Amino acid sequence: MASTSRLENNKVCCYAHPESPLIEDYRAGDMICSECGLVVGDAFGGPENPLLSGGHLSTIIGPGTGSASFDAFGAPKYPNRRTMRSSDRSLISAFKEISSMADRINLPKTIVDRANTLFKQVHDGKNLKGRSNDAKASACLYIACRQEGVPRTFKEICAVSKISKKEIGRCFKLTLKALETSVDLITTADFMCRFCANLDLPNMVQRAATHIAKKAVEMDIVPGRSPISVAAAAIYMASQASEHKRSQKEIGDIAGVADVTIRQSYKLMYPHAAKLFPEDFKFTTPIDQLPQM
C-alpha cells in the first residue's frame, strides 16, 4: 500500500515523488501529489491521526496531472478510489465539522482535540444511535468547552452548527450518560466577561454586573434560575444604573436567552438592588429610578 513521507524539515510529501509540489483541494481538505495524484494529507492534522484506525489515513488516490499518473497507453495508473474504512470517513467528517465550528467561535486547538476524543469514544461505543453525527459533534464540542474551563452557551454552539439548540441539549445529556463523564457546574462568572465585551460595556459596568450576580446567588435571591439568565439580568441592572444602558433584547441576543427570562430574574433581584451593587459604584440612574417589572 502506498504511504506518505516527510522531508527532513518535517514537511509532508509524496513518498514516490518527494520533490513534486502538492496541490491543496480546498473543498475536500486534501493535499494531493501533483505528479501521481496520491492524497498525502488532509486539513485536520496531516496524514497521521491517532484517533483513526491504525493511527493513520488509509491510501487515498486522486486523479493526478503529471506523467506518472498514466501508463504507456495513456490510461490512469490510479483510478479514483478510496480504500479508507467507512468508520474513518465518518470520523474525518465529524472532526472537520468540529474544527469548522471551533474556528468560527475562536476556540483553541486543545478544545478541538478534546471534542474529537469525546466524539471518537461515542462513535466507537456505538452510543447515541439514531442521532446524527452533526448533533453528536456539536454536543461533544459543547462538553469539551465545559471540561476545558471555557464554557459556551448552547446558543453559541447552535449558531455555528446545523443542529437545533434543543437537539444539542438532548445529545449533551445522552453523551454524558453514555461516557459516564461529567462537567463542572457553570457560574455567572463564566460568561460575564464575554457577554459584556460583546455588548461593548466598559469595565466598571462589567465589575458591577459580576458583583450583582454573585451577591444574588449568595443571598439565594434567584433560586432555580440558570447562571446565564442571572448574568443577563445582572448586566441589565448594572447597565441601567450607568450611562451605558442596554435593553433586555440587546442583552438577550448576546446571552441567548429570551427577554421574558431576563425579566423574571431581574424581578427577583430588583427589591434587593441596594444590597447587590458594589459600594463604590457611581450611579448615573439612582436605584429608585431603575426599571420596575
Swiss-Prot record:
Which residue ranges contain the repeat sequence?
Answer: 101-177, 195-271
| Keyword match Zinc | yes
PROSITE patterns on file: TFIIB, ZF_TFIIB
Q: Does the keyword Nucleus apply?
A: yes
Give any Gene Ontology cellular component: nucleus
Biological role: General factor that plays a major role in the activation of eukaryotic genes transcribed by RNA polymerase II.
Please give the name of this protein: Transcription initiation factor IIB
Biological source species = Drosophila virilis (Fruit fly)
Gene assigned in the entry: TfIIB
